């Protein structure tokens, strides 16, 4: 293809052993009932494909394209020193996620929310998954993961005479986010003891939750997205002063746009509570820049 088309395909399977995990130990064997030790095993398998092409290459015009896609599946295969099917897993510090054998890392561990006829969540009403007539921690279930199943990338670079235009886009498919800010939007939180209302997210007007429902899967939301990371425009003004100086001008925008169904600020933001937990108030900034490059 006259160096106009190239690509690569990789298939991988990786098993990681001896990861740290906190496990229970028999009474009297230590000064605590648990111990941090190397017992965790995780497998990662997937496929990566990339292709680069130059559809147009003439004296005045050159157009380069790049595309890549990756699929990954991670599964926890062991968390204990001995085989213990009754071991539920190790909960994360945020209380929303758990690591359990047979599931992805940082899977959400929540109650299954029930809804009324209009589709609105009912406060404090969850599905009794084990059918014992009581809603408790035994009704928590593994629901989705913050890790995307598919990751796409696309780049384009077009040059026409002295002008150039380039863009970079990314997409994550199959990743979920726990909307911690929405989970705190309750009516009890907007009532100040002094008698005036405080600010809250508008989701409180939809759910009408008075008390917190932080373990509801209602707040685990689809965070798949398409984002344009970068958009740039350049112009080469050429040489002047008897070819002693050259000038190139450029304009650039970062974080151009994002398309997503996620209801929070940003489907990629990572709060202080860990990956997949959104408790960040401030959105990711959009940056504009202008530049000039002098050549001597």
Question: What function would you assign to each model-found segment?
Answer:
Residues 23-34, 89-90, 129-138, 206-217, ...:
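Flexible, solvent-exposed coil segments and beta strand-coil junctions
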Residues 37-43, 54-146, 254-256, 261-264:
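Conserved small-residue
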Residues 19-23, 63, 71-94, 174-199, ...:
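Outer-membrane beta-barrel and related beta-rich outer-membrane complex signature
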Residues 172-254, 267:
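Extracytoplasmic gating/loop element in the C-terminal half of outer-membrane beta-barrel translocons
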Residues 6, 93, 97-168, 207-223, ...:
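Outer-membrane beta-barrel transmembrane strand signature
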Residues 5-13, 47-55, 63-71, 152-158, ...:
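Membrane-embedded beta-strands that build the outer-membrane beta-barrel scaffold
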Residues 1-6, 34-58, 145-151, 279-288:
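Outer-membrane beta-barrel signature, preferentially recognizing the C-terminal barrel domain
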Residues 1-30, 60-63, 70:
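Membrane-embedded beta-barrel scaffold of Gram-negative outer-membrane proteins
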């Amino acid at each position: 293809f006259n160096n106009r088309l190239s690509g690569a395909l990789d298939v991988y399977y990786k098993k990681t052993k001896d990861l740290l995990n906190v496990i229970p130990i028999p009474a009297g064997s230590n000064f605590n009932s648990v111990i941090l030790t190397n017992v965790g095993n995780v497998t990662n398998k997937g496929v990566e494909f990339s292709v680069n092409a130059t559809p147009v290459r003439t004296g005045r015009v050159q157009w380069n394209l790049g595309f890549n896609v990756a699929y990954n599946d991670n599964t926890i295969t062991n968390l204990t020193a001995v085989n213990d099917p009754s071991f539920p897993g190790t909960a994360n510090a945020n209380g929303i996620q758990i690591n359990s054998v047979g599931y992805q890392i940082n899977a959400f561990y929540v109650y299954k929310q029930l809804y009324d006829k209009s589709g609105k969540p009912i406060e404090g009403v969850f599905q009794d998954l084990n059918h014992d007539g009581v809603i408790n921690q035994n009704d928590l279930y593994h629901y989705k993961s913050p890790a995307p199943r598919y990751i796409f990338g696309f780049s384009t670079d077009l040059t026409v005479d002295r002008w150039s235009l380039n863009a970079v886009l990314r997409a994550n498919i199959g990743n979920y986010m726990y909307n911690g800010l929405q989970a705190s939007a309750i009516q009890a939180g907007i009532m100040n003891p002094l008698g005036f209302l405080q600010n809250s997210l508008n989701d409180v007007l939809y759910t009408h939750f008075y008390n917190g429902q932080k373990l509801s899967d209602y707040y685990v939301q689809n965070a798949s997205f398409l984002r344009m990371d970068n958009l740039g425009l350049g112009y080469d003004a050429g040489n002047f002063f008897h070819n002693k100086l050259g000038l190139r001008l450029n304009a650039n925008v970062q974080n151009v746009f994002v398309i997503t169904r996620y209801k929070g600020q940003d489907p990629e933001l990572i709060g202080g509570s860990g990956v997949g937990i959104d408790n960040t108030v401030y959105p990711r900034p959009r940056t504009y820049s202008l530049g000039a490059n002098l050549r001597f």
